[in-house]
UniProtKB/Swiss-Prot annotation:
Keywords: Cytoplasm, Methyltransferase, S-adenosyl-L-methionine, Transferase. The keyword Cell membrane does not apply. This is Protein arginine N-methyltransferase 5. A protein binds at F340, E449, E458. The lineage of its organism: Eukaryota, Viridiplantae, Streptophyta, Embryophyta, Tracheophyta. The gene is PRMT5. Methylates arginine residues in proteins such as histone H4. Pfam families: PRMT5 (PF05185), PRMT5_C (PF17286), PRMT5_TIM (PF17285). The active site is at E449, E458. It comes from Oryza sativa subsp. japonica. S-adenosyl-L-methionine binds at Y337, K346, Y347, E405, D433, M434.
Amino acid sequence: MPLGQRAGDKSESRYCGVEVLDFPAGEELPAVLSHSLSSSFDFLLAPLVDPDYRPTPGSVLPVAASDLVLGPAQWSSHIVGKISEWIDLDAEDEQLRLDSEITLKQEIAWASHLSLQACVLPPPKRSSCANYARVVNHILQGLTNLQLWLRIPLEKSEPMDEDHDGAKDNSDMSDTVDSWEWWNSFRLLCEHSSQLCVALDVLSTLPSMNSLGRWFGEPVRAAILQTNAFLTNARGYPCLSKRHQKLLTGFFNHSVQVIISGRSNHNVSQGGVLSGDENHTEDTAVRHALSPYLDYIAYIYQRMDPLPEQERFEINYRDFLQSPLQPLMDNLEAQTYETFEKDTVKYTQYQRAIAKALVDRVSDDDVSTTKTVLMVVGAGRGPLVRASLQAAEETGRKLKVYAVEKNPNAVITLHSLIKLEGWESLVTIISSDMRCWEAPEKADILVSELLGSFGDNELSPECLDGAQRFLKPDGISIPSSYTSFIEPITASKLHNDIKAHKDIAHFETAYVVKLHRIARLAPTQSVFTFDHPNPSPNASNQRYTKLKFEIPQETGSCLVHGFAGYFDAVLYKDVHLGIEPNTATPNMFSWFPIFFPLRKPIYVPSKTPIEVHFWRCCGATKVWYEWAVTAPSPSPIHNSNGRSYWVGL
């Protein structure tokens, strides 16, 4: 059964499995499964084949049991296959290498026959695992519904035996091996297959938090938690260190399932808990030997805070790639307007900014004689009109509003709103593109909500430059400035989703995405800034910048799949709005981050900076971005001349 109820969480991380250490021969598997399920485990990680088996001509695979001992739903829902651990496809012994290849293919074929959802592959036995990866890659090309989880120890381990001799002669060589490197090498050899995932062995010691953080951008499906990783509390029960608890919470938040593995190291006498045999099946009333460990895992899960309401709303958008809006080329639909209008935080910030501007514009002595002219450019269905009039009421200032909107469908709704609220004497509706309209008078305040996830990516600079002629020389623009930011990320899922399109164009497109399964590798840095009113209205809005990101040394090596983009806007003075992680406006959902992918992920060795170049390019009919990495290795210039992705003027 699930570890517990956590409001809003429907992910697979609610389910906990147990590793079967001994081969359940003959008809034992149903009893082992029944005992585990009755003890509140949800599935087994179980060997499918006798570990003593070696292939011989004409031999029959000594499987754990006939496929008939469990029903199809039980095989699919409650069994994860464990491939024989003796398999060594990079052994120097040729016979062992050949036997390993035959057995691996036989076991995967049997798992496919059983309709298992996943099989766990044994960890690489040495740093060089090219033949292992080659055989697995062959197998992956023939699989449809079966995932292969490569087992990787989550530790900074000593060098493998074959590497010791070389280390003696190289004083610069590190005395530790980063197990992430094993995974990365294997994944690259297998061409980033979306069906190749990771099962992390969590031991008693852990690398640094920065090093651990890399794994949240990788396709980790399970954390195999060893019983020797547990400590003992004052009452004799198993517990985890603070660092292990934090890691476990991170796994739960990233939909990673926990599998408990090992022998019981705690003699907990509670309801007949056994102290030794985790496969005991004789008395179903007796709790599983590893139940105390499961109880503790459930305790960690249940004490997590419920998912915030905003996260629950956004959960179905996690890591889902969307094309950015084209508000100039396209007219937004009613549903899109409605979604944005529900973002009360955004309009509260706008109202605060407008109120401050009104107070600065009109002194208390002049409130009865001065009427402020305010233009909302891109009025949509009227939320900024409402915010402006509420700010005027709040500050006691008189206001004359022009609502300029190019979408004729939105104008219909805008007319209805004005009539319903009785604002006919206060608001003049202009059905026109702001770049074409000739205003009858100059504005004191120009208000717009033309910002995209990257700040300028929905052409706010071009629109506001065109509307700036409406503004008095000392007029106020809200927003007054905005800055874009980027950071390098590991995002294996996003990369594989784009790769599935099998073309270059999708790798040269920027996507709006609710980032979830990612690893943030370095702090954000600013890219482009635009100010309004524009002090040089005739200057080009083209931009170019070069940035260098330093990845913390303790992180180790990493793989960069692309760059996450954000913005921060100054609406007026100290009132800001944005999604840049360090300064993000809380509880605002109008914008997800933007993602700029790389056609080929960039491997970044430890202690090596990343150098990236970004261009904002402008043509007669479109605006587009180009981007490229030049260090530690050069990438192609993405989206050259806007060939794959652009925003139409």
